[in-house]
A protein has these predicted regions:
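A cross-family signal for key residues in well-ordered alpha-helices
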Residues: 19, 51, 115, 142
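N-terminal helix-turn-helix DNA-binding core of bacterial DNA-binding proteins
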Residues: 30-73, 160
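Residue cluster at the C-terminal edge of the helix-turn-helix DNA-binding motif
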Residues: 39, 86-89, 151
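N-terminal leader segment of winged-helix/HTH proteins
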Residues: 1-40, 165
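Charged, amphipathic alpha-helical coiled-coil/dimerization segments
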Residues: 3-6, 82-140
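C-terminal regulatory/oligomerization modules of transcriptional regulators
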Residues: 1-12, 135-165
Length: 165
C-alpha cells in the first residue's frame, strides 16, 4: 500500500521471496498441466474439478459451490464443465430445489479417468514438492499457505472473490 510519502516498496528480502514464489508457482502449474495433458489429456484445473466432484456426496455438487471450492470464476467453471461434458466425464442437471441452479455430476467415465490419472498426478506432486522438503518444511509450507489463503478470502457479501464473478 502507498502512503503520502509514496509506495511502501518491498525490501530486498521480500522481493527475493516474491520472485521465488512467482517462479515456483508458475513452474509448478506448468509441471502439473504438462503431466496431466500427457497422461490424461486434460489440464490441471479439469483434474481438480473432477477431484472436487469425486469427493462430493453422490459425486454431485451445485455449480456455484464447485466454483467456490475450485476458487475460479463462474464463467471459467462453465467453460470447463462444458469441455468435461463433451468428454463424457461430467454431466449437468437442473437443481431440484432451485430452478435457476445446476448441479455438476461426475459420470462413471469421469470416475474412471480420475482413477487412471491419479497415480501419475500424485507422483508429479510428490516429485515437485514433497520429495524436496523435509517434514518440518512441509508443516511450515502448509501453515504459510493456509494463512495466505485465509487472508485472500475476506468475509462479507461484498468481497470480490472469483466464484462471485
Amino acid at each position: 500500500m502507498g502512503s503520502e510519502d509514496g509506495p511502501h516498496w518491498l525490501s530486498a528480502e521480500e522481493q527475493s521471496v516474491w520472485q521465488a514464489y512467482l517462479q515456483a508457482t508458475t513452474l509448478l502449474e506448468d509441471h502439473l498441466d504438462r503431466q496431466l495433458q500427457r497422461d490424461a489429456g486434460m489440464p490441471h484445473i479439469y483434474y481438480a474439478l473432477l477431484v472436487h466432484l469425486a469427493r462430493a456426496p453422490h459425486h454431485r455438487m451445485r455449480m456455484t459451490r464447485l466454483a467456490q471450492n475450485a476458487k475460479i470464476t463462474r464463467s471459467r467453471l462453465s467453460h470447463a464443465i462444458a469441455r468435461l461434458e463433451r468428454h463424457g466425464w461430467v454431466r449437468r442437471e437442473d437443481c431440484p430445489s432451485d430452478k435457476r441452479g445446476q448441479n455438476a455430476i461426475l459420470t462413471a467415465e469421469g470416475e474412471e479417468v480420475l482413477r487412471r490419472s491419479a497415480p501419475g498426478h500424485v507422483a508429479a506432486v510428490r516429485q515437485a514438492i514433497f520429495d524436496r522438503l523435509g517434514p518440518e518444511q512441509v508443516t511450515q509450507l502448509g501453515e504459510i499457505m493456509r494463512v495466505l489463503a485465509e487472508g485472500l478470502q475476506p468475509d462479507g457479501s461484498d468481497a470480490d472473490l472469483p466464484w462471485r464473478r
